[in-house]
A protein has these predicted regions:
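Transmembrane alpha-helical segments and their short flanking loops
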Residues: 308-423
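Juxtamembrane helix-boundary/capping and inter-helix hinge elements in multi-pass membrane proteins
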Residues: 32, 66-73, 79, 108, ...
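Membrane-water interface of transmembrane alpha-helices in multipass transporters/channels
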Residues: 34-38, 75, 173, 209-217, ...
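Alpha-helical membrane segments and immediately flanking helix-loop junctions
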Residues: 250-307, 335-349, 376-398
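Membrane-interface alpha-helices at helix entry/exit sites of multi-pass transporters
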Residues: 73-80, 183-190, 280-295, 324-325, ...
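Transmembrane helix-bundle signature of multi-pass membrane transporters/permeases
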Residues: 44, 48, 61-62, 81-86, ...
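Signature of multi-pass transmembrane helix bundles
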Residues: 8, 14, 18-21, 25-28, ...
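Short, Lys/Arg-rich, polar N-terminal cytosolic tail immediately upstream
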Residues: 1-11
Length: 423
């Protein structure tokens, strides 16, 4: 028996999740009545996810600001890098939202119990903007007011940097808290196969095999979003700003893009991207060693596109028709959430709560969406990481062009930014 347990634990988590997925489908089809006895596993998994949402949003964004605002990283080269990544991130969220609105992958999705979801009374735009600034920070954290939490996290991170030497110990504490949070998420993720087993079994028992149709449409939207992000955002930057020949650029980048797809990991892609940038693209070593590590931390076009797409998917699945103010809030919070995504596996799914909460969706409903999508996230992650790898090399080439025109970069080459797994 113990040998089987050890073999089970030795399997990669995504493989165990797939086993739980197939087992849940089988149980839901063959013994739908039995799903009532294992539904508590899905409920427990949802509660564990809800437990993580607020700490992830606050700690990851605050620590991200303190790390990014290192003066060594924010010279002229660093400032241009952040500006370009902010632009590509906003474009990526917009493209993801557009793909979701056009294809409508969430229509008819069987989320949780299938109970209708209703938004509360609409909040005027003025009040929504004013509510971004929390009157009581503790109350905002307890209530899961994500816009207020994001604002306070950014302000807290900036204040920590402005404190100088006195703020360094707390900045180190935030970095340590991020690593501890990573371990906590890893522990919760060990329960994922069982939570997925229960959630999928219940969904299949109630709705049949048609429950997977929406995932197919979602996967199609991810592919459309990645292609659109590269064609409509990266290619124009390469032509107009970096002055690069497109075919030659992507032939040089193919090694880094292949590693990004195969590993779904910025950590594995960064060394290859550095070699490609300096040897094949002839990008200045100082620029490459400054921009690419920053990009590994904040250059997540794939995540941004996915957060925008998944937000629209979730609203459609919950039967909510977004209006223009709601779409504007999704765009703003989606860009901020993607920019501050924590260095943890599938973090984009957890940051989804920050986006949906800003338009009135509860963390319980968001957790059900996460449980619905999570079994398939590995394959989707591989695809969207390609967009992030392309963005990192595109921005590096664009910054290199401007750096050559302005003279030597005034930022010290640094590899201090921690490469992270794409999420």
């Amino acid at each position: 028996m113990m040998a089987w347990v050890r073999r089970w634990q030795a399997l990669a988590l995504w493989r165990r999740v797939l086993v739980g997925l197939f087992a849940g489908v089988a149980l839901g089809l063959l013994a739908p009545a039995a799903t009532a006895y294992i539904a508590f596993l899905g409920d427990l998994f949802v509660r564990l996810i809800r437990m993580l949402v607020v700490p992830i949003v606050f700690i990851s964004i605050a620590s991200g600001v303190t790390a990014l605002a290192d003066p060594r990283k924010l010279g002229a080269v660093g400032a241009r890098t952040v500006a370009l990544f902010a632009f590509t991130t906003a474009c990526a969220v917009t493209i993801g939202m557009a793909a979701g609105l056009l294809v409508r992958p969430g229509d008819g999705a069987a989320i949780g119990t299938g109970e209708a979801f209703e938004l509360g009374e609409p909040v005027p735009v003025y009040d929504q903007l004013m509510n971004i600034v929390p009157v009581n920070v503790v109350e905002a954290l307890a209530a899961g007011d994500m816009l207020a939490i994001i604002f306070f996290s950014i302000a807290f991170g900036v204040a920590t940097v402005l404190a100088g030497e006195e703020g360094r110990p707390f900045a180190a504490l935030l970095q340590s808290a991020t690593r501890i949070l990573f371990r906590l998420v890893a522990l919760v993720m060990e329960f994922t196969p069982y939570g997925v087993f229960a959630l999928i079994a219940v969904a299949v028992a109630q709705n049949g095999i048609a429950v997977f149709t929406n995932i197919g449409w979602l996967a199609l939207c991810v592919v459309i979003g990645v292609v659109a992000q590269i064609a409509l955002v990266h290619v124009p930057l390469l032509v107009l700003v970096a002055r690069r020949q497109i075919g030659r650029f992507y032939r040089a980048a193919v090694d880094a893009l292949a590693i990004a797809f195969a590993t779904a990991s910025s950590a594995a892609t960064l060394p290859v991207a550095l070699r490609v940038a300096m040897e094949k693209m002839q990008i200045d070593r100082g620029v490459a060693s400054t921009v690419l590590p920053i990009g590994a931390s904040i250059g997540k076009d794939g995540t941004a596109m996915y957060v925008g797409l998944l937000s629209i998917f979730s609203l459609q699945a919950l039967g909510v028709t977004p209006d223009l103010p709601m779409l504007g809030i999704v765009l703003l919070t989606g860009a901020l959430a993607a920019f501050g995504t924590a260095p943890i596996p599938s973090a984009s799914l957890f940051m989804l709560a920050a986006v949906l909460a800003s338009v009135g969706v509860s963390t319980a409903q968001t957790a059900l969406v996460i449980g619905f999508v999570l079994p398939f996230d590995r394959l989707l992650d591989m695809t969207r990481t390609v967009a992030s790898a392309s963005a990192n090399l595109t921005v590096t080439a664009a910054v290199d062009r401007r750096a050559l025109a302005a003279g030597p970069p005034d930022a010290e080459p640094t590899g201090a930014a921690t490469p992270v797994e794409e999420s």
